[in-house]
Curated annotation (Swiss-Prot):
Pfam families: Ribosomal_L11 (PF00298), Ribosomal_L11_N (PF03946). NCBIfam families: L11_bact (TIGR01632). Gene3D superfamilies: Ribosomal protein L11, C-terminal domain, Ribosomal protein L11/L12, N-terminal domain. One or more lysine residues are methylated. Forms part of the ribosomal stalk which helps the ribosome interact with GTP-bound translation factors. InterPro entries: Ribosomal_uL11 (IPR000911), Ribosomal_uL11_bac-typ (IPR006519), Ribosomal_uL11_C (IPR020783), Ribosomal_uL11_C_sf (IPR036769), Ribosomal_uL11_CS (IPR020785), Ribosomal_uL11_N (IPR020784), Ribosomal_uL11_N_sf (IPR036796). Keywords: Methylation, Ribonucleoprotein, Ribosomal protein, RNA-binding, rRNA-binding. SMART domains: RL11. Disulfide bonds: none annotated. Belongs to the universal ribosomal protein uL11 family. The keyword Mitochondrion does not apply. GO terms for molecular function: large ribosomal subunit rRNA binding; structural constituent of ribosome. The gene is rplK. This is Large ribosomal subunit protein uL11.
Amino acid sequence: MAKKVVGEIKLQIPAGKANPSPPVGPALGQRGVNIMEFCKAFNERTKDMGSFNIPVIITVYQDKSFTFITKKPPVTDLIKKASGVEKGSDNPLKNKVAKLTHKQVEEIAQLKMEDLNTSTMEAAKKIVMGSARSMGVEIVD
């Protein structure tokens, strides 16, 4: 018989740096999950993912056990790393902060493909280019 799910928690936590302080502690504590057990498991699974924020979906069961799924880093984080900027433009229509090549866009789309809501590479590239445009990052050939 399958365990009864009592909740699902979605967080973004820096890779390899989960600790019991907010936002992790309060989110898990109110569901009765062993916070340190989650932190150790998450840090072990994400230790090689660099300094990205990693989206994680934690499923909590009635017996206070849990499972979690880690996703790829957000597209905006990948764009910032590829273009070498700290943050996007405050006015993306007027101020362009960086440039990305189509090859870099394709690499980001390839990496995020399994997390995106699309099945074709062309659609994935359009999603990445749209995110880049809204950050003030220009796409060049």
